[in-house]
Amino acid sequence: MANNFLEQLVAEWYEYKGYFVRRNVPVGRRARGGHESELDVVAFNPTLRHLVHIEPSLDAESWDKRERLFRRKFEAGRKYIPDLFDGYELPPDIEQIAILVFASRSNHPTLGGGKVLLISDLMRQIMEDLGGKKPIANLVPEHHTILRTLQFVIEYRKKVFDTLR
């Protein structure tokens, strides 16, 4: 189980899209205990041969502090991810994405070596994909609770949003 809403949403989305997902993976075991880092979400789609490391964040830190934190996380990802999916031939490149809530891409299209994706853009992608899938014929599986909720909000948006006026 993910530690927060954003990690859970990202993990559900990639699982729903056919990826094998690892969450909150401690990597780089230290001799005296503990780990070098923790990778929030790592997803692999063997059919597409796509490997992605996602670090969602709700922080409002300075860009300098974010740069240091995400650089450390993404470097650990490049170092340790190749060992996480034993038995699979992984692609040589790992797509790395920082998903941010409180940010703008205008001055910061990348962070720590990864691409910046705003939560609004992720939500748009999800809503566009789910928007064409009626629950009666294409219900999101029940273990993807956030995605299923979004699917119902999309399906019943007129009734839902009319009550807010």
Q: Where are the predicted features?
A:
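Intrinsically disordered, low-complexity Ser/Thr/Pro/Gly-rich regulatory segments
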Residues: 1-165
